Amino acid sequence: DALCLAVLSAQAQQNLAATEGAIAGLSDEMTTASVDDLVGRAVQLFLSSQRHDLTWVMAASELRLYAAREASLRPEYVADVAHMSELFATMISEAAAQCGLTFILPPLEAVSVLQAVYEHTTIMGLIEGAAPDSPAPGDRLAAVFRSMLRPLD
């Protein structure tokens, strides 16, 4: 269980670092670029740091399924996911606010939706035989991300 948690935590830390990098890479443009450009670039930067190979995608999915099956792993897994989700939600909601935007739903729910879209599109791409560098995950993630934003009141 400790090994599974370590791998899942490392994956979450990698995703967090990718998101931080995407936001940092956009910080100079946040007040001048269009929403579509910012979302597109943020998603592109995030995806460029992700591992898309079959082995890694399958291993990550199997680890999550293992957490679902093993009651002893669940409390730590749930706590780790909650912690990482809070960090992601804070990071992306603050970045959105810098652009004069906010989410149409609570940021934690937005993170959950974005994660589900990314995971589903990536896994379905592998099942359907799409190339690892297929634009589909990024296009779908950007479209959903944009659809969850609205101007600040």
Where are these regions (language model features)?
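Helix-loop "lid/cap" segments that line or gate small-molecule binding pockets
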Residues: 44-51, 58-69, 148
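Hydrophobic alpha-helical connector segments
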Residues: 6, 13, 17-55, 107-114
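Hydrophobic core segments within long, regular secondary-structure runs in both alpha-
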Residues: 36-43, 85, 89, 135-146
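Hydrophobic/aromatic-rich alpha-helical bundle segments in the mid-to-C-terminal region
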Residues: 74-75, 95-153
